[in-house]
Amino acid sequence: MSTDLILLHAPSIYDFRKKTILYGPVSDLIPPSYVFEMYPIGLTSIAEYLGRAGYQVRIVNLAVRMLRDGKFDAEAFIKRLKAPIFGIDLHWMVHCHGSIEIAKIVKKWHPEAKLIFGGFSSTYFYKELLEYPEIDYVLRGDSTEEPFRQLMDCVIRHKGELEKIANLVWKDNHGKIQENPFSHIPTDINNVMVNHYGNVVRSVIKHRDLISYTPVKDWLRYPITAVITCRGCTENCVICGGSAAAFRKCYNRGKPVFRSPEAVIRDVRQISRFSNGPIFILGDLRQAGEDYASQVLNLLQKNRVKNQFILELFYPASKDFLRQMSLACPDFCLEISPESHDPEIRKVIGRPYSSQELEQTLDDALDVGCRRLDVFFMIGLPRQTPQSAIETTDYCGHLLERSRGDKRVSMFTSPLAPFLDPGSLGFENPERYGYHILFRKLEEHRRALASPSWKYSLNYETDWMTRQQIVDTSYEAILRLNQLRVKYEIISEKLAQTSEQRLRAAWEMSRRLDDLLSKNDNEAIDRLKPEVDRINTFPVAEKIQLEVPPPFIKLKPFRALWSLVTGR
């Protein structure tokens, strides 16, 4: 059966295998690599929704394929693909280089095919995207499943009119941009993501192509999955492009819409049929209220699966709530991101709680049986000086000391990089928060991403730190934290030495690249590629530390196949 739509996910930089780029510690605290190969969960939702409407949809993670196989020819692969419509996600801004380069290749070999962009960044930069001749349509918003179906009906079945599809921006036959009303903002999302994980398993079997559906390079070794609870957010974190303010201004969503507790558990059960790996329930369950959180946790307790859970807090929690987490998800992992040790900085960025409240929550989480407790801090915040960022590392030492070296406690810090999110309060109101936005256009961000050093991809400075200070402070703070991990035996001496070697080599390389860039010596920069690539591919201690030890049998292919056959 022919394919109607192929959804492509690009690497952050299309030709990352050829360019000399020192990526820095920009992806150390997330599952994907510096190529940001993870595709948004919206692709699986769209594929499943369109599948129920009778369309044949395929997902291809080009980024993973390019990472896993140095000889993989992305252009030749795209040339062989056949479909009347291609879709490319530009959700996270870090994909703005790769996504557009992939678009050019698609149109080069499939000039008659229609090309659609979608995602948060596509929504924000929709006007600039349609200036590229390769892009025919942009679907705006956080819930484009139904508009996408209507667009497929128009293009494939010649039913309906483009002018009547909500959220669509498109080019007419004369090349003029037409902007339809941005009005499809569903307040009920229980008709999407009904069986999207099951649909992925079915598609893998159908296309005999597991690698194209894997979200990250090492997923087969560490099969972590995610479950979302809502679209939108209740919080207003200054640095986040997914804040309540950003959703109102950029995505037309006045308030978040939540999936039913039953839908959340349905996802968990779908995942448990094919994977024994950890499940990350994204977002603070209390966003929809304490009753909603209790319902989800009660259902998790009643529908027990063997997978380990990673849960998230946006702000401190009561011991009773943490105990409920422990009963529902034994040996759960917990994450919280205060971002700074300084309560005044936390208040400015949207974390208005005291250090005493934070510390009480950490104590209580350990007391009720939390298996691992991850605390995240950040560099590049309003009112944060280099000294303040270093003092945050000292505060990490204080937290480790007061936990008496409990090895369940892990501290992390990283720079706000590569971008301050377009749409975030800091990006939209920089003067208020002390940010200096260095580039605003989509094309400026694209060029910056391809710079030889991560310093030059930063789209901001602050009243308190230059880009150079952000780079230097980041390396110094991470090195200090690395030493604390050794002191409290959180990581091994060997891993710490590897981490220090990587960080110091990267810091020194950033200085060498600065010097060569000041001389405009591009040939010398190109000669450094083997050394830069070696630094980029060093083991990352933080990624290793963040992994939940998976069981020996990580995936359940026969159980997944049986589930597809029987529907159980």
Put a short name on every predicted segment.
Residues 2, 17-20, 171-229:
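N-terminal [4Fe-4S]-dependent radical SAM core
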Residues 2-7, 17, 56, 78-81, ...:
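Radical SAM enzyme core and accessory elements
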Residues 3-11, 82-83, 102, 258-259, ...:
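A structural motif corresponding to the C-terminal lobe/cap of the Radical SAM core domain
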Residues 35-45:
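Conserved alpha-helical elements of sugar-nucleotide-dependent glycosyltransferases
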Residues 43, 47, 74-78, 99-103, ...:
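Generic structural signal for well-ordered alpha-helices
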